[in-house]
């Protein structure tokens, strides 16, 4: 079997990893093995973070909507149920933006939800 010399491939791989680890402290930015471990961990954490970000924003929107609905005398779950019954199809991001930037319009949405719940 012929001998495989990996000079170019290995160099390319090492350069890629060391470029990704630029800015890391100490050997993590200079030594291939530790840099590779750090880069793998960083990429894994970045992937996880992108998934967690979606959950965190949803939690934030729900907390904001809940605070605004309670200020208008209704709980979050009853408000969402009332909106569904009223046929108002709005996502939580938009509802939270309205609650922050236009409280008057948000209180109208709460009234519409209350009306449907009482009917």
UniProtKB/Swiss-Prot annotation:
It comes from the Bacteria. NCBIfam families: rplT_bact. This is Large ribosomal subunit protein bL20. The keyword Ribonucleoprotein applies. Belongs to the bacterial ribosomal protein bL20 family. One of its GO terms (biological process) is translation. GO terms for cellular component: ribonucleoprotein complex; ribosome. It holds the Pfam family Ribosomal_L20. GO terms for molecular function: rRNA binding; structural constituent of ribosome. Binds directly to 23S ribosomal RNA and is necessary for the in vitro assembly process of the 50S ribosomal subunit. It is not involved in the protein synthesizing functions of that subunit. Keywords: Ribonucleoprotein, Ribosomal protein, RNA-binding, rRNA-binding.
